[in-house]
Amino acid sequence: MPTYDNHHALKGLTLGQPTEYHDTYQPALLQAVPRRLNREPLGLYPDSLPFGGADIWTLYELSWLNSKGVPQVAVGEVVLDASSINLIESKSFKLYLNSFNQTKFANWGEVRQILERDLSACAAGKVSVALFRLHEIEGQPVGHFDGYCIDEQDIVIDSYAFDAGYLHNAVGNEIVEEQLVSHLLKSNCLITNQPDWGTVQISYRGPRIQREALLRYLVSFRQHNEFHEQCVERIFSDILRYCQPESLSVYARYTRRGGLDINPWRSNTHFTPGRSRLVRQ
């Protein structure tokens, strides 16, 4: 399992530490985690990644002051390309956003540009930001993942230790194209051990994956410690290795914490992720 959990790159994170909250703009609050920490143990390297994708963040607690001192509120969407050198640590992201609270900005466009600049610098990669006024997104329906939900199987599970071996010999001879969904994805934060709850959609074309084996595999994340983005890349890599589909997309949407939710997707084919929040978001 992860050999990087005590890596020096994680030692300075504010995550899990007593924290001072700032309400005036401080970009230095952002903290990066190198993606290579979990990619290298999986045999993933920048010049030969088997997937594209992004981490889609939703910002529910974003506020600043306009030039006249009147508070502004927005919902933000940040798309961080999976090819970036770093991922952005979520608690530092929250603290950074808090630093906007008592800071004056000329207009919404300035806020968006500053967010893009700072987040791109932290991630060392491409970041896009959209800001929405509340009336623009009020009334949007709760979405759902297309596909067959594998959660209602009548099986006994008594082991919750991560085990990619559940996917070994877990395919048949029939070639199919399908989408499978589970709401039972749960892992733990790498630093704090706090639970992370998610729904995952697996879209593939290839030998049919045994649904019992896949469910056992996903449930085995239940006591596993990794960041959201890392779990999705592990799922993608394990399915690609053991099940050898012709095409594969893995998309997870996690419940929010600290006013943020993280929704990573990875794919080796054309894939357009839905943006609607799910029922637990």
From Swiss-Prot:
It catalyses: 7-aminomethyl-7-carbaguanine + 2 NADP(+) = 7-cyano-7-deazaguanine + 2 NADPH + 3 H(+). GO terms for biological process: queuosine biosynthetic process; tRNA modification. Its EC number is 1.7.1.13. One of its GO terms (molecular function) is preQ1 synthase activity. Coiled coil: none annotated. SUPFAM superfamilies: Tetrahydrobiopterin biosynthesis enzymes-like. Pathway: tRNA modification; tRNA-queuosine biosynthesis. Signal peptide: none annotated. It is found in: Cytoplasm. It is an enzyme of class 1 (oxidoreductase). It comes from the Bacteria. Keywords: Cytoplasm, NADP, Oxidoreductase, Queuosine biosynthesis. GO terms for cellular component: cytoplasm. InterPro entries: GTP-CH-I_C/QueF (IPR043133), NADPH_dep_7-cyano-7-deazaG_red (IPR050084), QueF (IPR029500), QueF_N (IPR029139), QueF_type2 (IPR016428). The active site is at 189 (thioimide intermediate), 196 (proton donor). NCBIfam families: QueF. PANTHER family: NADPH-DEPENDENT 7-CYANO-7-DEAZAGUANINE REDUCTASE. HAMAP family: QueF_type2 (MF_00817). This is NADPH-dependent 7-cyano-7-deazaguanine reductase. It comes from Erwinia tasmaniensis (strain DSM 17950 / CFBP 7177 / CIP 109463 / NCPPB 4357 / Et1/99). The gene is queF.
